[in-house]
Amino acid sequence: FELSEGFFVLDPLGQQEILFEVGGVSNSPMGEGISGVLSEKMFSMNPMAYEVYQEKFAVVREGVARGDSFLLNLTVATGLDTNWTLEEIFHRAQSPYRLLVPGRFVCFSPEIFVRMDEGMISSYPMKGTIDASVPDAERVILEDYKERSEHNTIVDLIRNDLNRVAERVDVKRFRYIDRLRVSRGEILQVSSEVTGRLTGDYYSRLGEIVFGMLPAGSISGAPKPSTLRIITQAERERRGFYTGVFGYFDGKKLDSAVMIRYIEVRDGRYYFRSGGGITINSDCRAEYEEVLAKVYLPFGNERSK
C-alpha cells in the first residue's frame, strides 16, 4: 500500500515460492488438501475493542468534516484464533484471485484492479456489501443513500485515474451485483466497470500505467492525497501488502487484483485485515460491525466478473 515493498517474479509459472491464481492462471499444485480432520478446524476472531475503533473513526470524521476527504476507507486488523494454515486457506479458498507468500500472508480477493487487453484498460471498483439473507437485500443496498454516495465517489475517482492513462473513458456498467458464497452463507457485493482506450506502445509503459493508479481508489478514498494523510493518522500502523495489488502478465494481457480479503502472520499470530468506507453520513457502530462482517473464509463459490 505504501509502495515500499514488492515482488517481481520473472518465471511465475515455473516457481513454487509464491503461489497464485489470477483469473484462471495459476502455478498452484493440484490436489493439495488439509491436514487433520475438517470437523476439528476452527476459525474465530478476537475483534478490536469498539472504543479503539471509535478513536480511529473520530479522526476520520474530523477530516471529513474539514472537507479534506469525501470518502475514506478505514481498515483494521482483527486477531484470529484458528488452526488453519496459510497454505490450507490458499488451497481451499474459492476466489478468482489468490496469492500466498508462505510465512507472511494469504489473500483471496474478489476485486479486480485493472485488466489490459487489446488496447483496452478496464477497472472494476467494488464498493458495497450486504448479507444476502437480509430481506430484499439487492433492493436495500442499491437504494441505500450512503452506499450509493460511496460508490459514486469511487467510480468518479477511478474514472479520473483512467483519464490520466487512457482515452475515451466510459462507465460501461454501473452498480451491478455479484452474489458470492462464503463460509457463513452468501453476500452481495456492488461493483461498476470503467473502461478506456490505451494509445501508443502501452506495453512499454505497463509499470508506469499501473503505478500511476496506485493506491487503488476503492481502498483509499477521495481526494487521494489528503485522504492518504488521514489514513496514516487514523490507522497508526502500516498496511504493508494489504490493499496493495498483484497480477499476471502473459506478454499480451494483464490481469490484476486489489489485495483485500487478507490474512497475515505477525509474531506468530494471525490477523485478518478488513475495512469500510467512511463518509459524513457514516454511523460508527454500523461501520465497526461491517469490518467484522468481512472477516470470513471464502470456502464457497466466489465468482469473477
Model-predicted segments: where are they?
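Extended alpha-helical targeting/anchoring segments
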Residues: F1-K305
